[in-house]
Amino acid sequence: MKRVIIAAFKQETSTFNPSPTTRDQFETVIGDDIFSLINSNSEIGGALKVFEAASVTVVPTYATWAVSGGPITQNDLKLISEKLLQSIFDAGEADGVLIVFHGAMAGESEFDPEGRVLETIRN
């Protein structure tokens, strides 16, 4: 049976928005609580249904998301990224990793945090 790690780090940043996004604005579910999203209208909800139908073993790790806002403060971006990455590394070996990103996230001084997270996982 295939084993897939699932995680999320999702926020759409508008660099024109002067109000920074902080970790307090993120909703977070960790570990098995991610399974509570199966009936949500979300990427994770859809993925959980597909994986269940395909008899894929899902390893839930860390999922966090916020509404659109200004750049994420660097300290909070670092903290959230570290929690996400540690949860993925702690999950052990897997056949794949599914990470839900928005694709337009930015920190106060980091313009591609999603790319950095992916690069860290690959290496």
Regions found by a protein language model. Give the residues of each.
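Active-site histidine-anchored catalytic micro-motif
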Residues: 5, 10-12, 16-18, 26-27, ...
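Low-complexity, highly charged intrinsically disordered N-terminal segments
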Residues: 49, 54-68, 75-76, 80-85
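Charged, low-complexity, helix/coiled-coil-prone segments
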Residues: 19-35, 56-70, 113-117
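N-terminal amphipathic/basic leader segments beginning at the initiator methionine
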Residues: 1-54
